[in-house]
Amino acid sequence: MLVYVLFVVGFVFLIKGADLMVEGASSIGKRLNVSSLIIGLTIVSFGTSLPELLVNIIASYNDSPDIGVGNVLGSNVANILLILGISAIISPLPITKNTYFIEVPFSLTATLLVGFLANASIFGRSTEFVISRNDGLVLLFFFFLFLGYVYIVSKQRKSEFSADEYKVMSMPRSIVYIVLGIAGLYFGGLWVVDGAVTMARFFNMSEHFIGLTIIAIGTSLPELVTSAVAAFKRDTDIAVGNVVGSNIFNLLWILGLSATLKPIPYDVISNSDIFMIIASSTALILAVVVGKRPVISRWEGFFFLVAYIWYIAFLIERG
């Protein structure tokens, strides 16, 4: 029973730990006169992906790589179909030109790249299905290309990064926040992974299934709440771009760094999940083509949500 309580508490620790670490590091950055633009692109962007990253690294070193891979792929499907679906039902979501013509195609390319590298044995590159250290470095290379693009776009929209956006605290308090954040991330990640393994064994489910569903939804909850609240406030200008950017971070940064630290065994059953990400990303493009305007309408959001429910049913059937 305790392990399931810690499993739930682990998600809280992960999310709050990332928040504390970002607040502390951002405060120190402001004290050192680092620009709000750089803080937003580095500390905040990387900090918000820390829960998924810690889960992946801990799962990998605990010999449960299926949890990590499932978490990344499941989060990407949930980001598009669940988060954008619910948000669009609340309020139609505009898609910016950069998101439509650059970021969504880049996300599709990243998904195809992960699929190609993971299935390298089919092409005679190796004898086993694994995302190797070299593959991880390739993913990181493309990630830093994407980061360069984000930097260029952000400089053009520099006015969006307010100097007052990040709270400045005393240095001791900032350090305490960072230490507490690191502790929360570590113990939260540990409890989530341990709980997932125990749950999989008890209910006779695969670790991959747990990663694709419960952990993926759990680590996506902050984005879901933020996007839903923004939709209620009609503040949805960059909602789609944020989700697509998060998917690129997951595929290139989290999988890339995790594989560089320790090669990740890959189960070919994940190919159907990669296909689902490709289909979801393609649906984003079709939403504009079918609707004849750059927006995800309410009925398209409903379609996304139904597709996600169907995907969960498919995963339950697959086991």
Functional labels for PLM-detected ranges:
Residues 1-319:
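Hydrophobic alpha-helical segments, chiefly the membrane-spanning helices
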